[in-house]
Amino acid sequence: MTRTEAFEMAWKLAAKEKIFSLVDEIYHPDYKAVGSITGIEVNLAADKEVYLALIEHLILTPAKTVDEGKDFLRIERYTKYRETDIFMSGTTTITYKDGKIITQESVGEELDYDPSEGQDWNW
């Protein structure tokens, strides 16, 4: 299983079943990230809370690997808000320590078009 697949599977289980065992397996105990909106440093527990609050409003496409090295991974995905036609493109850059995620940074950009048009997937 690739690191992108492991990341995807872990967070998908968390979204569907609210089970974080796979998330806990792939994250380093010293994990820290800076919230992209608040600029505040957060730990994994805070990331889990935010994820659960947001995911019920979003439809996510599968993550696609953009770039990968020994200690980093960059993935891209599209999101759509369930309640309205707001589309986003997001990139997450992940760094690893001892084979586990130690930091991640996500950057999103609102799109003025539906990225599913002309693709082999839809919402």
Segments (PLM) and residue ranges:
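C-terminal and inter-domain tail/linker signature
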Residues: 1-123
